[in-house]
Each structure stands twice: as structure tokens, then as C-alpha cells.
Amino acid sequence: MKLCVALDLSTKEECLQLAKELKNLDIWLKVGLRAYLRDGFKFIEELKKVDDFKIFLDLKIHDIPNTMADACEEVSKLGVDMINIHASAGKIAIQEVMTRLSKFSKRPLVLAVSALTSFDEENFFSIYRQKIEEAVINFSKISYENGLDGMVCSVFESKKIKEHTSSNFLTLTPGIRPFGETSDDQKRVANLAMARENLSDYIVVGRPIYKNENPRAVCEKILNKIHRKNISENDIEQNYEVIQQKEWDMCNHFEEWIKTQPDKEHALKEFYAKCGIKY
């Protein structure tokens, strides 16, 4: 699983400063529509000068097939590593985009947007007359069969997409709140444990990182959880009965206690050690 940091700040200078703070970390950067319209293609070049970041250009391209292919060709010339288009543009548009990009010796990954994470079931149904999961699976099959590399989806559809396509079909999941932060304008949000459980290949995290006074520390904490076998909430639930059998008075108040700990990882290590369970 890869961490993709959303550069959704108010100015180019703030975005570049954040990128500088995150140098030498194993991360991707996401440049969205706002930053691209405001700062232009030269912003991509400036980011590359800060560090050799992998860049996801998140423009969600959606138009008639030829226009989509033209747009994808142009942004691919920028040397970005991933782009996305709307799956609802249809099979012909997807085919035309992939045919156009086949001439590149090294093309970017192309993912299809399924259902925006700002949708809930009611609002999605009012437009598409389908349930979210049903539509996402349909979009995913069309995208997979016509040569795309993966899907942009919520965590809740990630595993289902792979079941209906291939384990190698990538899923990028926005709306990640790694440590239980507020969901803001996102409706279908999830944490790191859920992203891992549902086989997300890329997770997008924005506000929990760039609104923190120490964004690098937050990134490092997320990366630490990604790159090791972390004790997830599921692990805690599965071992809870075992833990309760141990004579340690914190067991009965575990959930309340862990929330009060400034260094949760260290606290969990001590907790498991006292309970005689291997960390």
C-alpha cells in the first residue's frame, strides 16, 4: 500500500513548502484540479525539482472520447506517473484514451473514477438509478476489460472490485482518515486498518496531514503503519477475549485508556507485553 498526499492547499507556495517538508519519504503527491488550474503545468516541474516524487494528476477527465484522448495525451507529456478519467464516459472513451497513450514509451498509470466518495447512497441513486456498489462493479468491469490500470473508489468497494476483475487491478482510495479525524465533506471515509483489510493499493490523505502542525511526523507515522504488520483494530477485537483473561486492570477499560495515550504504538507494546501476548 502506497501513501499519496493531497496537495490541496490554498497557494502554490504552501504546496511547495509542504513538498519540501516531505522530501525523501516514500510517498506520492496528488495534484488536483484546483492546483493545476491555478499553478499550471510548470507546477509539476517545480515539484519534481523539490524531489523525485511520484505524481498523481487528479483531473478526473470526462468529455467526449476524442477530447478525453487529447487531454490525456497532453497531461502525459508532463511526465506525471498517474492520471484518472471518469468511467462513466464509457467504453469507447476508455478505448480511445488507451490507444492514444500506447504511443508513449512510458505512459502514466490510468485509473477510472467510479463513484466519488462525497456521494452517499441516496444522492448517488438520484443520478445513476443504481446502488453505489452495483454501479462501481459495473464501471470496474468495463474499465478492466478495456485496458485501464485500476479504479478510484472508496475503501468499501476496493475488495469487491478485485474480486470481479483481478487482484492486480489497482485501487486508489480517497477519504482516508488515518487516526479517526473528522470526515469533512467526504461521506464514505475509512481508516488505515480498513484500507489494508480491503486491499487498497494507494491511499489518499490530505487534511489530516497538511492541517497538522507537523505534517512530516504524520506521514512518517502513516508510513510506519503501512510498512509493518501493525496491530489493527481488527487484531484488537480478535484478541480481546484472550486479553480479558489476563489479570490486568486496564483490560476492562481498554478503549477509553488507549485514546488517552499520546504515543499509542508504545502504549500498545506495553499493553500486549503485560498481557503476555506477542506484539
From Swiss-Prot:
In this chain, substrate is annotated as bound at 8, 30, 58-67, 117, 177, 186, 206-207
- GO CC aspect terms: cytosol
Lyase as UniProt keyword? yes
State the name under which the record lists this protein.
Orotidine 5'-phosphate decarboxylase
| HAMAP family listed in its UniProt record | OMPdecase_type1_B
Indicate yes or no for the key word Lyase. yes
Q: In which pathway does it act?
A: Pyrimidine metabolism; UMP biosynthesis via de novo pathway; UMP from orotate: step 2/2
The coding gene here is pyrF
The UniProt keywords, alphabetically, are: Decarboxylase, Lyase, Pyrimidine biosynthesis
Source species:
Campylobacter jejuni (strain RM1221)
Secretion signal span: none
User: Which CDD domains does this UniProt record tie to the protein?
Assistant: OMP_decarboxylase_like (cd04725)
Identify a single GO molecular function assigned to this protein: orotidine-5'-phosphate decarboxylase activity
Q: Which InterPro entries match?
A: Aldolase_TIM, OMPdecase, OMPdecase_AS, OMPdecase_bac, OMPdeCOase_dom, RibuloseP-bd_barrel
Role of this protein: Catalyzes the decarboxylation of orotidine 5'-monophosphate (OMP) to uridine 5'-monophosphate (UMP).
Q: How does it assemble?
A: Homodimer.
Q: Name one Pfam family in it.
A: OMPdecase
> What cystine linkages occur within this chain?
none
Q: What is its EC number?
A: 4.1.1.23
SUPFAM superfamilies according to UniProt: Ribulose-phoshate binding barrel (SSF51366)
Q: Where is the active site?
A: 60 (proton donor)
Provide the catalytic activity annotation.
Answer: orotidine 5'-phosphate + H(+) = UMP + CO2
Domain of life where this protein originates:
Bacteria
Homology family: Belongs to the OMP decarboxylase family. Type 1 subfamily.
| Matching Gene3D superfamilies | Aldolase class I
GO biological process terms, alphabetically, are: 'de novo' pyrimidine nucleobase biosynthetic process; 'de novo' UMP biosynthetic process
